[in-house]
Amino acid sequence: RYYVADNIFLPEVIDELREFALTTDIRNEQYKEGYFSINYDSTYVPLPLIRDVVLGLQNKFPFLGEFDRGWAFVYNNEAPGVTPHADPSRYNVNLWVTPDKCVVDEEKNGLIIYDIKPPLSWTYEEYNSSKELIRKYLDYTKSKKTIIPYSCNRLLIFNSKYFHETNNVSMKDGPMNRRVNYTFMFKGD
């Protein structure tokens, strides 16, 4: 159901992605769960390196197919993070870029993937944003979860149609210690 690869990118690439996310003035969306997004898609990327990363992923993993859209999330140092949801794209590729030395609680900061997709009858709003409905469904179905632990320069590929969420965020104080992840959504081949 998922694939994990560590240290797939050069440290310089990880550092540049992190530096950009932490210092840019771009703030596309602010979320009450303690993070903001920097959005991009196939027609607009705010940093040329992002396009290079997308091309590198497509070359290394041809099954990913066409790039759809993506974002970087920059989290508060302590935050609940992204709530359970599913996405419409076939593949979700997550890349974590904050150094491990910035982590306070090693049991947090990763990603939880559930073993269930939403019912086919659910709308995008229901499976992507209806937190209460999703939590009830996960409880009702007794879905099992897998926790992927956080690690800097860790790449995680999974079917984004399965419910998933952030495993809370707990990083050291200071703006340069904030958890940053890049998400790349692909349509599949």
Name what the model sees in each region.
Residues 2-65, 71-81:
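Non-heme Fe(II)/2-oxoglutarate
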Residues 65-189:
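Catalytic core of non-heme Fe(II) oxygenases with the double-stranded beta-helix
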